[in-house]
Regions:
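Conserved binding-pocket/active-site segment within a compact domain
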Residues: 110-113, 117, 126, 138
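A short, acidic/glycine-rich surface segment
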Residues: 61-63, 116-121
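Conserved catalytic-core motifs of eukaryotic protein kinase domains, centered on the activation segment
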Residues: 113, 120-122, 148
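Domain-scale signature associated with acetyltransferase and cell-envelope carbohydrate enzymes
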Residues: 1-110, 133-134, 142-144, 152
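Glycine-rich NAD(P)-binding loop of Rossmann-like domains
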Residues: 70, 121-135
Length: 154
């Protein structure tokens, strides 16, 4: 029992010292299980209160934003959000996840094509924002592509 509490304290310490500085803002009462398996890349990534992330060495979690031309990707995560192992969120435009959402294992959210369909050397391609309204649950291994809005309580 004491060993489990010690491990949880270490997870909190690791998150506060190594992951928090990578977020533009990170709300209170967050918890990341195995935080060394969460990859935060890019600017303009923020999360609200009570974010819970479950990461694993075999199913890492990735939050990535990309800049191109004069644009910057953005990920905004609301309060009370659960992100499960293997989730990837990539943004070249904007991904908005509102309060009380759950992302099951292996989900992928992307707001860009990541290349043009005619000229594959053209970076990023077409982008359109993604919005998950409040109380949305994205099921196991789901893919949410550019321009999608999922309504409240879905």
């Amino acid at each position: 029992m004491w060993l489990k509490r010690l491990h949880q304290r270490f997870d909190v310490w690791f998150t506060d010292h190594f992951l928090s500085p990578q977020f533009e803002s990170l709300g209170s009462d967050h918890f990341v299980m195995k935080p060394w398996n969460l990859r935060v890349y890019g600017r303009k990534i923020s999360a609200g209160k009570n974010l819970h992330v479950i990461a694993d060495s075999s199913r890492k979690v990735s939050l990535s934003t990309w800049a191109y031309d004069d644009k910057q990707g953005q990920i905004e995560i609301g309060d009370n959000v659960l992100i499960c192992p293997g989730t990837r969120i990539d943004s070249a435009s904007k991904v908005l996840i509102k309060n009380n959402c759950m992302l099951a294992a292996g989900t992928y959210l992307t707001d860009a094509d990541w290349h043009d369909i005619y000229d594959r050397t053209k970076p990023i391609g077409t982008t359109k924002p993604i919005t998950l309204e409040e109380n949305v649950w994205i099921g196991d291994s789901s893919i949410v592509c550019k321009g999608v809005t999922i309504g409240k309580n879905s």
